[in-house]
């Protein structure tokens, strides 16, 4: 057996093959240990000592490491994770009011989308993450806090530009012989990559979709989200409708609200018009401050008025409360400790 890639990115039958086990059930055993957070072959007590030693010589379970851990007073946890090539990403644990624990995972080192209001978008893009590097973020978080309830791909990067690896990671995390996380508890967030939305819909996964709309004003969206705006709002609406119809699931529209930028009555009406005919729910996200970006968090009255306008139009809407601000772990802040 020759040295192989990190086993955290493999399915049971692939572990069986690369490890050249004689017994067919050994791949499942190793897969279960990895899903349970094991990082040492010698701790896999249902394997023979000879097999454990052979695995330790030829394979690695994980090739990432946590280099920093930050905790906020609101319960948010941010991990800085170093990859094999010394590049770095961040993963975040979010805890809501009823103590549900959600892993916010990254899918790229940096991000090519260059959204004007996002810290990660200012870093530029280095490379995609592998499935193992995505899975390991989840495993690192579970080692810190125990069982996680949900996963959101809302960390660093555009998931639709690394969809194969993202879906591969989902397959591993949801595998019934491993972690067995329900696909229904997983959300993929995109800046509005239409081709990716169609592709995700056609894969027939049970995951949820969130779209970072930010504004339904085309010129403003082109300024705030220059790469995402390459697909017109009309094309984006068609892609969302396709996902609605193909999956039968409601789509979340995310609006990062910035003071005096996208919070007027006209902007609200444009969102209402965009949402018409779609099965969507709107999330309002007051912009989280980033030192190098010169926007401002909206006043409470701006957010409340915007929310009221959507409610009056019978658009389902929720205001997301800020979490992780104290450690740079909130929406739009990731990358401060990572670099590219």
From Swiss-Prot:
Location(s) in or outside the cell: Cytoplasm
Keywords: 4Fe-4S, Cytoplasm, Disulfide bond, Iron, Iron-sulfur, Metal-binding, Methyltransferase, rRNA processing, S-adenosyl-L-methionine, Transferase, tRNA processing
InterPro entries: Aldolase_TIM, Methyltransferase_A, RlmN_N, RNA_MTrfase_RlmN, rRNA_lsu_MTrfase_RlmN/Cfr, rSAM
Residue numbers binding S-adenosyl-L-methionine: 157-158, 189, 212-214, 288
Keyword Hydrolase applies: no
Binding site for [4Fe-4S] cluster: 111, 115, 118
Record note on cofactor: Binds 1 [4Fe-4S] cluster. The cluster is coordinated with 3 cysteines and an exchangeable S-adenosyl-L-methionine.
Disulfide bonds: 104-331
Coiled coil: none
Keyword Zinc-finger tagged: no
NCBIfam families: rRNA_mod_RlmN
Function according to Swiss-Prot or TrEMBL: Specifically methylates position 2 of adenine 2503 in 23S rRNA and position 2 of adenine 37 in tRNAs.
Alphabetical list of PANTHER family matching this protein: 23S RRNA METHYLTRANSFERASE, RADICAL SAM CORE DOMAIN-CONTAINING PROTEIN
Protein's name according to its UniProt entry: Probable dual-specificity RNA methyltransferase RlmN
Primary gene name: rlmN
């Amino acid at each position: 057996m020759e040295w192989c890639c990190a086993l955290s990115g493999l399915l049971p039958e692939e572990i069986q093959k690369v490890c050249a086990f004689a017994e067919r059930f050994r791949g499942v055993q190793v897969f279960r240990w990895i899903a349970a957070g094991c990082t040492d072959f010698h701790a896999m007590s249902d394997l023979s000592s000879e097999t454990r030693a052979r695995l330790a010589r030829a394979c690695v379970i994980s090739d990432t490491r946590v280099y920093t851990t930050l905790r906020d007073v609101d319960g948010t946890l941010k991990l800085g994770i170093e990859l094999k090539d010394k590049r770095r990403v961040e993963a975040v644990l979010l805890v809501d009011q009823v103590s549900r624990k959600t892993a916010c995972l990254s899918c790229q080192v940096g991000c090519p989308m260059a959204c004007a209001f996002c810290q990660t978008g200012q870093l530029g893009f280095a490379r995609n993450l592998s499935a193992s590097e995505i899975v390991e973020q989840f495993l690192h978080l579970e080692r810190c806090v125990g069982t996680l309830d949900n996963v959101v791909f809302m960390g660093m990067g555009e998931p639709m530009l690394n969809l194969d690896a993202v879906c591969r990671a989902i397959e591993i995390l949801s595998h019934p012989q491993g972690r067995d996380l329900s696909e229904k508890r997983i959300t993929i967030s995109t800046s509005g990559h239409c081709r990716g939305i169609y592709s995700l819909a056609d894969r027939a996964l049970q995951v949820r979709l969130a779209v970072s709309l930010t504004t339904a004003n085309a010129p403003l969206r082109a300024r705030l989200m220059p790469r995402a705006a390459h697909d017109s709002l009309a094309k984006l609406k068609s892609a969302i409708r396709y996902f609605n119809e193909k999956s039968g699931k409601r789509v979340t529209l995310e609006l990062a609200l910035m003071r005096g930028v996208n919070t007027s009555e006209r902007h609200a009406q444009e969102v209402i018009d965009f949402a018409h005919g779609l099965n969507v729910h709107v999330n309002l996200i007051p912009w989280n401050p980033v030192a190098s970006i010169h926007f401002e968090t909206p006043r409470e009255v701006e957010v409340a008025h915007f929310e009221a306008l959507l409610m009056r139009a019978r658009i389902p809407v929720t205001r997301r409360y800020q979490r992780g601000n104290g450690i740079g772990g909130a929406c739009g802040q990731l990358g401060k400790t990572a670099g590219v």
